[in-house]
Amino acid sequence: MLGIQLNTEAYVDRLQDELKQIDQVAMQRWADHIYRAWEQGRFVYILGNGGSGTTASHMSEDLGKSTLPESVLHDESRKRLKVLSLTDNAGWIMAVGNDLAYDQIFVQQLMNYGGAGDLVIAISGSGNSPNVLNAVEWANRHELVTFGLTGYNGGRLKQIQQDGLHVQLDDMGMVESIHLCLFHWVLNDVHARINSVGRYAAN
């Protein structure tokens, strides 16, 4: 944990340095995948454990509500982004964990929901969470699109994902913070494209 060794100024400086090293092309591809899912009417599933699990919930909430302006949220004619966090059905997760195995909690949901062309965003700081890997492996076999968010050395997730964004850093807290920080740019980019505003405004 970097905060044990670094004071506030050094910690913020380190965070700034790490952000500058991020693959910005991968950030754009991340947004592209989500926008394509919206265009094609596909579902987006987001999953992770612990802090990454709450990030999955946060991303799902933002993508569900904030890809359209609040002024049109009552307009039923507007096309919506179909997005679901697989971390939020506590009863289902507990039932699968208790009756089958904890490494099945995401893949069992995908078996019910997932279809070819849907997008799976898999978040794992270590890249080695068995329940995340099982879900990604299933998604790959069934022609879903898989995009991983990883830290440390990327683990196995970085090897099996179809695409992804990697934070090369051995500090879980900062990795999780960076994942969510970058997501907010992705959200803004997708919003701008769907609504033809900002950089995507019609000339």
Feature names for model-found ranges:
Residues 112, 174-203:
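A charged, well-structured terminal subsegment
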Residues 36-113:
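Glycine-rich, small/polar surface segments that engage phosphate groups of diverse ligands
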Residues 149-161:
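Short, glycine/polar-rich helix-capping loops at beta-to-alpha or helix-loop-helix junctions
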Residues 1-22:
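Generic N-terminal amphipathic, Lys/Arg-enriched alpha-helix
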Residues 41-42, 117, 143:
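Glycine-centered short loops/turns at secondary-structure junctions
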Residues 52-57, 128-135, 157:
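Short glycine/serine/threonine-rich phosphate/pyrophosphate-binding segments
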Residues 22-40:
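A short, well-structured juxtamembrane/interface segment
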Residues 87, 124, 150, 165-173:
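Short beta->alpha connector loops at strand-helix junctions that form conserved
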